[in-house]
């Protein structure tokens, strides 16, 4: 597996297209546990978006976004659940270039190494933030695109298997609660 050490900035480009005509109504947030979610879910059905969303940034499928002040808790995600949406202007948005498989980068963002690297690059004393430049300066070991795809697919398969097992465990727990309730009425 041929690898080379490069920097994330060699493989991504910042996006900042705005919702100028307010045509996109799907306001999204990035959660550290669920990735992109509709803002109404993040804030329990409260409307926190501005009435004027013309300055909000447009994100499309496979684009990434993060809140610079919340990345230290894992609030960075790739859009996979919607075709497009808009995020607050404070978010930093970017996409991968053709030489980086988005899923590979997505899994890298879940790694301990990534969190160690962002800790080195946070700026500010009270509210520590990661700039786009700070993200771009993080080293990244890049195999060929074909190997990236293989790694991404394998990790996705494992994630699906884990989800199935979790779902099965929840089913067994519900059955147990039901039986306990029936037995000890």
Give residue ranges: language-model regions.
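A short glycine-rich beta-alpha junction/loop motif
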Residues: 69, 85-90, 123-146
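Periplasmic-binding protein-like
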Residues: 114-117
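Amphipathic alpha-helical coiled-coil/heptad-repeat segments
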Residues: 1-6, 142-185
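Sequence-specific dsDNA recognition surfaces
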Residues: 9-20, 28-61, 87
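A short beta-sheet element
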Residues: 54-112
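Non-catalytic DNA-recognition/assembly elements of restriction-modification systems
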Residues: 1-21, 137, 141, 145-146
